[in-house]
Amino acid sequence: MDSLQLWQRYCDWLYYHPELEIFVDISRIRFTPAQVEALRPLFARAFAEMQALEAGAIANPDEGRQVGHYWLRAPELAPTAEIRQAIQDCVEQVESFAKKIHCGTIPASGGGRFTELLWIGIGGSALGPQFVAEALAPLQPPLNIHFIDNTDPDGFDRVLGRLAGKLGQTLVVVTSKSGNTPEPRNALVEVELAYRKAGIPFSAHAVAITGPGSQLEQQARQEGWLAVFPIFDWVGGRTSETSAVGLLPAALQGIDIRALLAGAATMDKATRVPHLERNPAALLAMAWYIVGEGRGRKDMVVLPYKDRLALFSRYLQQLVMESLGKSHDLQGNRVEQGLTVYGNKGTTDQHAYVQQLRDGLNNFFVTFIEVLQDREPGIPSPFVEPEVTSGDYLDGLLQGTRQALYENGRDSVTITLPRVDARSVGALIALYERAVGLYASLIQVNAYHQPGVEAGKKAASAVLQLQRQVLEVMREQKGSLTLPQLAEKLSCPERIETLYWIVRHLQANGRSLVLVGDPGRPLELSIQPRPA
């Protein structure tokens, strides 16, 4: 296909939303008219299923749940008056609370305004807020945000170290839908301890975002925390950015949450259109399906040419991979579906792995994200060369990479935003939420549950239970044991490798036992009680 034919293909398949000023270009995905026609019946089904989902049908059959994240930015579409009111009340409560924090009506326990925000969450309770904070937070926000999004003790120490001397001005928000997810629970325990050691009342600094009736909600209300915000049963973590999970941190940082919601709502309206060529999310889903042969055979490399959007690929990893990575389809057939996502930002990645993308394995397609506005209005861009700015270089490198990849048989999609603001970020989030939902319908998987995550939690629980048994044995043990002897004593010879991992970790942290011998020869090690 020559350059003029490519230009015509670009014009034929370009989607533009005049209100949002967003472009979607799938012209550099190699597909034929026959492939498009073959997908039309599948899209007819996908549009119908999406319409039923928005009307309140059970769209998560494995858990018997409705799926209602689209209602969050269009409460009038919610199936009941109670849900509509709950959504509206939540947004108003978020705005009111943020205003009281900003103006000092709700002061820090030691007096004065809060200046720091410590956000505790995992998965969608962290990835969305992190992405939006990086993309939209002002240079001097009302509160500086810090994240704990793991159960890494060293990570806790580093974050709390940065807050040394500032805990008295720090607002702590704990986010957990179930209220007993281990990672945020562990962080809560450690942060509470830090407040006790500092002699600061934790409850006067604490906020919960959780499901109604959860263990976390009960604790927050019993201890008199500053506020409790809801996570609705019909909102999943990876689609929670327009719920209190995403709106509260944004509002506290001074981000316009009404604009974020408006951008998402406007994109939702566009992606509700039951016509393939006029629906930008359907165009993305079609591109993914064709390039990966409906089996996710090619990875999606996300390259936003904007520093503010550098965390978008991490956010998309969860949204896409947790939604689409399923072992079985809706009919119970084993399918092992998925779509791998990775990326960082342009032009950095051109000096990292784009070499392989251009000349190595052709097992991917690229999603370029272009932002037309180089800097904030009123800030001039100097010329770095005659008639060329740094932003011109950024744009030229995006175009050059797109062309170089296509010329070597590498496909790509390009999303163009007018600027990075709350409205466009809300629209971008909504675009991909819908694209994932439509693609899930095409391949017939449940996009709204995550059994693999639960399997990992159960396995971890079994490891910790075995560790408790090891500690109990070693407290009573007078002499040394080998690993096989320990396994026999615990009646679990089949778990000897797990035992090795456990005792190695316990020794490294100075707990209850010591290992004598060469750690590289596990069967020769002697396990001894640690001297008192």
UniProtKB/Swiss-Prot annotation:
GO terms for molecular function: carbohydrate derivative binding; glucose-6-phosphate isomerase activity; monosaccharide binding. Keywords: Cytoplasm, Gluconeogenesis, Glycolysis, Isomerase. Its EC number is 5.3.1.9. One of its GO terms (biological process) is gluconeogenesis. GO terms for cellular component: cytosol. It catalyses: alpha-D-glucose 6-phosphate = beta-D-fructose 6-phosphate. Pathway: Carbohydrate biosynthesis; gluconeogenesis; Carbohydrate degradation; glycolysis; D-glyceraldehyde 3-phosphate and glycerone phosphate from D-glucose: step 2/4. Its main location: cytoplasm. PROSITE patterns: P_GLUCOSE_ISOMERASE_2, P_GLUCOSE_ISOMERASE_3. The active site is at E322, H351, K457. It comes from the Bacteria. It is an enzyme of class 5 (isomerase). It is found in: Cytoplasm. HAMAP family: G6P_isomerase. Belongs to the GPI family. NCBIfam families: PRK14096.1. Catalyzes the reversible isomerization of glucose-6-phosphate to fructose-6-phosphate. This is Glucose-6-phosphate isomerase. It comes from Synechococcus sp. (strain JA-3-3Ab). The gene is pgi.
